């Protein structure tokens, strides 16, 4: 985690890069939770959530059913292509036929997470959740390409961290948060 902070160090002050890191950690957490939940729903169909083709009629039917259940159970929804791991792969150039420029899509996804909660019990919890993550800030880089490169580095670093969501005894996300807060406080 501290490597991620070091990637942003010197570009902005600690309070600012803390907002980006914690925002991306939360996006990763929401994505992993969504992916695990959708995978459980799809077990009887023998497919994984990331395998659902969003461009087919059957894929749309899956997404609609999963969306309804996810909003009820989790309070938010992400499409397979909006998952953190998929964006990290795409940004890193690991997705065949896809452009590795992800900034615009990432902004849209973070907005979509918040908007997916409209009219649900979780709406207030998600309102302006990612507002402190200004992906257009020149502090991330002078050019769009430089901003994209920096954000991709952060996503790729974070993608390698396993939050152990399957282990309800561990609070890895909470531990990561406390670790970062301690590091920011100490200097």
How should these model regions be labeled?
Residues 1-187:
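Non-catalytic, mostly N-terminal accessory regions of nucleic-acid modification and defense proteins
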